[in-house]
Swiss-Prot record:
Protein species of origin: Streptococcus equi subsp. zooepidemicus (strain H70)
Keyword field: Amino-acid biosynthesis, Aromatic amino acid biosynthesis, Cobalt, Cytoplasm, Lyase, Metal-binding, NAD, Nucleotide-binding, Zinc
Subcellular location: Cytoplasm
Official protein name in the record: 3-dehydroquinate synthase
HAMAP family xrefs: DHQ_synthase
Keyword 4Fe-4S applies: no
Cofactor: Co(2+); Zn(2+); NAD(+)
GO process terms (BP): amino acid biosynthetic process; aromatic amino acid family biosynthetic process; chorismate biosynthetic process
Cofactor note: Binds 1 divalent metal cation per subunit. Can use either Co(2+) or Zn(2+).
Pathway in which the depicted protein is active: Metabolic intermediate biosynthesis; chorismate biosynthesis; chorismate from D-erythrose 4-phosphate and phosphoenolpyruvate: step 2/7
EC number: 4.2.3.4
Length: 360
């Protein structure tokens, strides 16, 4: 069974196709493109698991393959340069297509290449992790890390098509599954407390049909937000809850100790604690948020004992959401969220970071 959501964009509208058949939905878009070349960008793990998918398109299209370096290290200008070389050697033109098959790292990397090669070529996202299905593949954010700073170089460049299949989730580790749940908890806590409550009880039975419904709900919320605020003027900032601190934690751990969903979980708990201190959020809500993460064995405290408040502060000062001399945090409230600016030289922020590290 196939279901389609159409996402409106000021750049180009695009469909999100939900299907159990990962081989067919691409054909309509590619048929309209005519005789095109395809460059598949993936990683070794996904390639080994889904070789039939790649072979299927090799039969019908002039297709090429780029296997990126493992983990977050592939979100780099060096990897981008290697892909440019691959495209040039294969004589790709502006009408040809990039297809990303993988998690958020692969989607961000391939999308950035598509956005910048010939000033923009078509690309298709096939997200294979829960996190990339409900979050990173939707909305057109693409980019790479630079000198240890998360997503420092990037753009907003929507895909031409997204293929979402729950079948990919069958091969996810528990840890990767939990990382995707982390982003769903964020969406539920800020935008849909009913979804949040469903996520609280879901680990007890793991009903697959319920999981599909929750994925669809989370995607619908992300779709609604990016349609209303594609370029992150206000509403889309709500999706950055946990990400200011989370990205700083990722950077200081060199994207190795914590995966994205784990760092964001810690960031959400830390930022929710500040919201409680500011009387924006109840202690009961904070405890419910912590309980949700703990239900999926997601971390809520820092294990990196060598991390200091001063080091966190240094990275926070480079965050792309900052405004002038203010570090901007997205804090949850009882009924939603607020943008909370703190002066970069405010000693209270440093004291708060120290207190969080002591609690951890």
């Amino acid at each position: 069974m196939t279901q389609t959501l159409q996402v409106k964009s000021r750049i180009n509208d695009y469909p999100i196709i939900f299907t159990d058949d990962i081989f067919q939905p691409l054909n309509q878009f590619l048929a309209e493109k005519g005789d095109v070349k395809l460059l598949f960008i993936t990683d070794q793990t996904v390639f080994d698991l889904y070789q039939p998918l790649f072979r299927r398109f090799q039969q019908d299209y002039d297709s090429y393959l780029h296997i990126a370096a493992p983990g977050g290290q592939s979100k780099s200008l060096e990897e981008v340069s290697r892909i440019y070389d691959r495209l040039i050697r294969a004589n790709f033109s502006k009408k040809d297509v990039i297809v990303t098959v993988g998690g958020g790292v692969i989607g961000d990397l391939g999308g950035f290449v598509a956005a910048t090669f010939y000033r923009g070529i078509s690309y298709i996202q096939i997200p294979t992790t829960l996190l990339s299905q409900v979050d990173s593949s939707i909305g057109g954010k693409v980019g790479v890390h630079f000198k240890g700073l998360t997503n420092m170089i990037g753009s907003i460049y929507p895909p031409n098509q997204i293929i979402v299949s729950a079948k990919f989730l069958d091969t996810l580790s528990e840890r990767e599954f939990a990382c995707g749940i982390s982003e769903m908890i964020k969406i539920g806590f800020i935008h849909d407390r009913k979804l949040f409550q469903q996520l609280l009880v879901f680990p007890k039975d793991r009903n697959q049909e319920q999981l599909r419904q929750m994925i669809f709900q989370a995607i619908c919320h992300k779709k609604r937000v990016v349609e209303k605020d594609e370029f992150e003027g206000n509403l889309r900032m709500s999706l950055n809850f946990g990400h200011t601190l989370g990205h700083a934690i990722e950077a200081l751990c060199h994207h190795e100790l914590y995966r994205h969903g784990e760092a964001i979980a810690i960031g959400m708990v830390f930022e929710a604690k500040l919201a409680v201190q500011q009387q924006l959020l109840s202690q009961q809500d904070l405890e419910a948020l912590q309980a949700a993460f703990e239900a999926y064995q997601l971390p809520t405290t820092l294990e990196a004992k060598s991390m200091t408040a001063e080091a966190l502060m240094t990275v926070l000062k480079t965050d792309k959401k900052n405004s002038g001399q203010h570090i901007v945090l997205i804090l949850p409230t009882t009924k939603g969220y607020i943008s909370f600016p703190i002066a970069k030289h405010d000693n209270h922020l440093l004291d708060w970071l120290r207190s969080l590290l002591d609690i951890a």
